Amino acid sequence: MKFIVSSSALLKQLQQISGVINANTVLPILEDFLFEIEKNKLTVVATDLETVMKVHLDIEAKDSGKVCIPAKILLDSLKNIPEQPLTFNVDKNFAVEITSDNGKYKVMGETPDNFPKEPAADDANSFTMTSSALVTAINKAIFAVSNDDLRPAMTGVFFELDKKGITFVATDAHRLVRYTRSDVSCPKKDNFIVPKKPLNLLKGSLPDNDDELKVSYNSNHLFVVHGGTELVCRLIDARFPDYKVVIPADNPYKMVVNKHDFQNALRRVSVFSNKSTNQVALSISGSVLQLAAQDVDFSFEGNERMTCQYDGEDLQIAFNAKFLIEMLNGADTADIVMELSTPTKAGLIKPSEQGEGEQLLMLVMPLMLNN
């Protein structure tokens, strides 16, 4: 089997799917790319048994066939080869010889028979959405996903489908993000949980533009197709917690503050906080917001004050500054709105204006105030 392919085009596509491959895998075949050649088309597949990514390239080829090629050595070599046509020759024992303008490189491939088969999209429901809508949703929600494997339902993003739109929810029990798109229409009410890893892979490979994606799902898998790139992942088989019950219906106190100034003040003051809690206390009175942090063990203390617009009774409430800083990144407006209640009730964070066709709400649990 022989084919000719552009070195830079091949490298670009391989880098797009190489994130699927785990460094420490149990099965050696999972360290390989599967190359499939048919009618001047090359399909390259990578999998970790949970997620499959596939890309398609145009090549010059007279025959068809398959071979598994070790991913790391192929990527390392392509990174150092300038743009030029490369000729791949594969013999009957799956030995691969790569010929460039000035060199010849050999690597031992493997039989494709041992490469895992990808899941089929049987009984799948489908809908379309723009690439930017999915990328934005992933960016808004993924930071709140839990890393606690003992609670598998929280280790992914919950997709709640409706004819009126999609709601994306993520929580780690300390904070929660709910992001709704009303510019996407789904065929029926449904829901599923997508793991963090494939979402990060989609975020890295999809363009932030209005390209159309085809999204399909069945009871076990999610399928996303964009142009010549395909991703299939196993869904999390667990029940997502009833997130609606934890969102306060009425937080009477409202504070509007400049996002950039608030983030920077949190960064400065949190340097002096206890490193295990990152606790920063907010004292709000009139148009003054006071931030305070301390680490009693080391006699560290930091205080700052800034202006805000506040409608409510004087309040002192503490939060994890690291969480607040991360959550504020999700708001795309110059100002953010915090809706608060008592020092023991969850606070809500929203952008001062919602984008067209989208609604973002973030919830953060308070910490017990240090005396």
What are these regions (language model features)?
Residues 1-371:
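Structural preference for solvent-exposed beta-strand-turn elements
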